[in-house]
Amino acid sequence: MQFTTNVQLLLDGLNTVTRALSARPTKQILEGVHLSAAGEHVKLTCSDGNLSIEMSISADVKEEGTAVLPGRLFTELSRKLPGGEVTIRVGENHAASIRCLSSKSNLAGMNPTDYPEMARVAEGTTVRIPQDKLKEMISRVVFAIATEDNRQILTGCLLEVEPTEARLVALDGFRLAIQKAVMPFELPGGKENVRVVIPGRVLNEMSKVLGDTDEYCTLVFDQSRMTASFGTTTLSTVLLTGEDIDYRKILPASFRTTALADRVGVQNAIDRASLMAREGKNNLIRMSFSGDTLAISSNAELGDVLEELETELTGDPIEIAFNAKYITDVIRNITDEKLCMRFNSNVSPCVIAPQEGEDYLYLILPVRVFT
């Protein structure tokens, strides 16, 4: 195999596909990046056995063929190349020679016949959504996905698609995040909805390679796998299976207290209070709503913080405490001018949602404080 391509093109491709590499691969071959040169393109593929990412780059292919090179080392080497054009030639012993201007390197490879073929969904339910919209949806909920849990289903994110809207739902046991995209979706075969759980790691990596464009990302699902295609990139992953939590049952039907406050003011006050909260044993922030005042406070052995802001309160006064990180994660993902918080008591969930509309919804469990 031999081809010549632009160094930046090669590096962009490697930076994309190596996101699928595992820190602890189950097989040595999965430490590598698979290269397939044919026609006027080279396909780069990496996989951890569950997640695979493939990207096609333009190249001047002199000799078609396949190769597997050490993924991280090849990427770092490509990053250090002087620029311009790079020529890569792989011989019968699987070793690669890499030539770029005055730079010459040789890299031991592996047998490409040992590399597993990328699994794709050939037939299934297809959903198309603009890349920028999907990227935004992921960024608004991914923080609420459980990183470790006895229930593996919570380490994923629920995607629900109906003819008029799509929803991403994440739940880690302490927080619930829902982000909607209201737009028409064509569901094949008269289906009324699609409901799948995508691994959190997959969504994290997708959000980093999706473009800021209204060009579509095509998602194809079967019962156990999803294939996503956008631009010159294809991603394939297994889906999580099992009984997910019915999040609708968690959402309160009504509220005793509603508070409106300036979102930027609340965020800045919480950021300052968090500095002190992190020094305490429980990382707590207290919020006290009374009359037209919101008091945000935290304390530790080293000191304390008290911030007061104006608020519009409807209903009963309330004092409630939250884990500083959980409340910070939520508020940083809101862009509305006004922050709308709804409560029933200081031991029941707080819901943060738009003052008008239903684009997003966040639910946070408070921390019970004994005084």
Q: Could you describe each region identified by the protein language model?
A:
Residues 1-371:
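Structural preference for solvent-exposed beta-strand-turn elements
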